[in-house]
């Protein structure tokens, strides 16, 4: 009986499935209806190519990009080797530069526990990236038009890191565009070895006979302002400070600290970004051999590389002043400043007769292996940690004379480095350059 009921139930299911299947099957197609009314045409979209070629054309971006390849920002920047260094990268990598500008990072030192900390830094995650177009033109690809070239990343007044933010550079010409350059092209701070705060440069001028380093590296250090080593220096980008007439150790003297007209009426762009000529001008940022910026309306007339009053004479004056100051920076006939005849590593080879590079003549076989050979009158003993020296190098170091420095000598070293590494031999700011050098010469015995 149960089997019969099961068979009967299965039959009903099959019949039901057939009925439902038949109900869902489409019927025959009906007669076609009349066509509906056409809609209106849509609005044409924006031509993307037309927007791009406003900038990406042979005469605009392509030209600037080619010029940039010839610039030191393009091929010689230290972005790779400094990447990750939160102190150095604000001037060596794109992300770090944009970070300090966007966040208005102060160039101050603050006390943290028992030591001072340099606040002008980025963070590890924003410490990479080559210098590119967007480093200075941070609004690129915002509206996708020529308007994106400006505003520049910053034209604000620049707080000087060398002075821990107590001095400021603000160059007014061309809407402050030079401030963008000076943001990086400025000297770095000297740190007082005993206090760890920024060096008190004013004290160097008010107490010139005081001791900056007494020749003993006692621990803890309670007296020495510096422990001089080969790399005790202002770094390399001093041009902004000299151009602005700020930042030097201003010893009192007979030569007044004034500026040439360049400081008020000229901009970096006037001379370094003129019409391209060979490997100079435009976004090469190279001014070598170009005088169109000098010969602009309201400035000079007919100035060339052979012009005496405004080119050859002032440069010769500054070179002689550098030589005269170096001659006074000696101890028992031994140069305090380092000589380096190698034209590849010494960018300032031609700026002084004895080919000083701005470093100190202190023994450092790691970073300056040819130091003793390059300085025939002698080299001073290393004052810092020598644990990385081989035993033979330690033996050499032990036999070398000890260096000592007065405040006047330390301040004069700083001024020598500022004026040498300005790299213009006074053209940026002849009056201020000569005041620093002449008054430094006069303060030394």
Tell me the role of every PLM-derived stretch.
Residues 1-10:
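Bacterial N-terminal signal peptides that target proteins for export
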Residues 18-22:
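C-terminal motif of bacterial Sec signal peptides marking the signal peptidase cleavage site
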Residues 23, 35-445:
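C-type cytochrome heme-c attachment and multiheme electron-transfer modules
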Residues 24-30:
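Bacterial lipoprotein signal-peptidase II cleavage site
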Residues 11-16:
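Core hydrophobic alpha-helical transmembrane segments of single-pass membrane proteins
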